[in-house]
Amino acid sequence: RRSSSAASDVYKRQEYNLPVTIGKICSDNNVQNFTYISSLGASSKKTNLYLKNKGMAEEELRKLNFKKFIVIRPSFLIGKRIEERLGEKIGIFAMKCISPILVGDLKKYKSINAEIVAKSMINISNSEIQSGVFEPPQLLQIGRE
């Protein structure tokens, strides 16, 4: 139990406290635009700790009333990494295996390249869009423009 509680504290600090604190600092210093990288499926109502913390952070950041507030919700990120982790290697392999069957409504769960996500963030930031939540289908389209 202790390790589970410690893990949930770490998750909350990383996925909720840190972005909300940064958001408040930005808001207090009159930063007009804020882009938050969340996760596909994020919701404060989820039981999954990662998705719940991401969803709670989205809600708190939204309350800060930035002129332009963008939420980026990528699926499983792939691409170059400084450090390789076994769990991520397994995830990448698994996504490659199941990707061909992710069609229709499931298509948004396909892995997405981090470079595409970065390009879409830049394109959205430079656009007239004032706010919105962007998931993989939109990110793929905007990131290739």
Question: Where on the chain are the PLM-derived regions?
Answer:
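Aromatic/hydrophobic pocket-lining residues that form the small-molecule binding cavity
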Residues: 19
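Single conserved hydrophobic/aromatic residue that forms the stacking wall/gate
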Residues: 1-7, 11
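Oxidoreductase cofactor-interface core, primarily capturing Rossmann-like NAD(P)-dependent enzymes
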Residues: 44-132, 137-143
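SDR active-site strand-loop-helix element
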Residues: 34-40, 72-74
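Hydrophobic pocket-lining residues that define ligand/cofactor binding sites across diverse proteins
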Residues: 26
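A short helix->loop->beta-strand "cap" motif at the edges of active sites that frequently abuts
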Residues: 29-33, 65-67
